Amino acid sequence: MIIRTKAYPRVGLVGNPSDGYFGKTISFAFSNFRTEAVLYETPELEILGSEKDHSRFENIWHLANDVELHGYYGGIRLLKATVKRFYDYCREKQIELHKKNFTIRYDSNIPHGVGLAGSSAIITACLRALMMFYEVSIAKYTQANLVLSAEVDELHIAAGLQDRVIQVYEGIVYMDFSKDIITRQRYGHYESLNPRLLPPLYVAYRDDLSEPTEVFHNNIRDRFERGDREVTNAMRYWAGLTDKVKCCLVKGQTEKIGELLNANFDQRRKIYRLGEENLKMVEAARSAGASAKFTGSGGAIVGTYQDQQMLKQLKKALCKLNIKLIKPKIASSKGKGRV
């Protein structure tokens, strides 16, 4: 029996730049890239890495370049953390697991380090494979919580629920993480929206920017927990923008969404320390008439465009900066794996 499961990158369309601040956000998953987990029964339990987890290099320069691109941590730690958290969950819920062992490996072509949630995609795909292998059914909102727990509790990575929710639910989802909701039920209010409501969107990225998200968000987290008024006001502002974008989608007023996305980024720029190269991406897109904001922690942007002529101008402006542009295909498949 061979189990194959996939998970997809996500775009934070509007709302909080992260998601652990009791705010609101709209995100979507898209299938232009993917992470795949492959699991099959074996005599012993073994976790295999991908090409990014290799430990053999051509020379010292190759090693240094690999570390600069991918850091010191590959995907094996993510798989181990997921298996451990899945086991703990089943033990807590008194779910008896069969005694068979397995080998699991993953492969991902999601651009690394550009704010598309590639790490949580690995965990999500792994969790889906484990659920199929052990025939354990877990509610979607709990799956998202488990993915988050694998990162936060097991690996001590600063993270919130947004990425994990959209990668579990897929499609496009409105999320409300208001404190009263989170306190009452330990997860947010999640509402799937019709992808057909979206205006024409683009995603653009480059793979030589940004830094790990767990580093990027630390300063804002500290300020938020201290009650910094500038940060708390920004979180409320982003939550309000999220409701406005949702209203525009439902009413078919998509021509108004671009300016709201721009406002989302402009507010972010006021409280975050943003790298010059990241800013150039946004400015280049806006120079072509498109809207632009980060998809996540930096390195990739998302925005709206009016027509094919504007898209052509957008591609031209971004190409000058060696930035790749795609039209995202919304991931909304119901099948999570194949045996």
Show where each model-derived region lies.
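Helix-loop-helix module between adjacent transmembrane segments
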Residues: 112-114
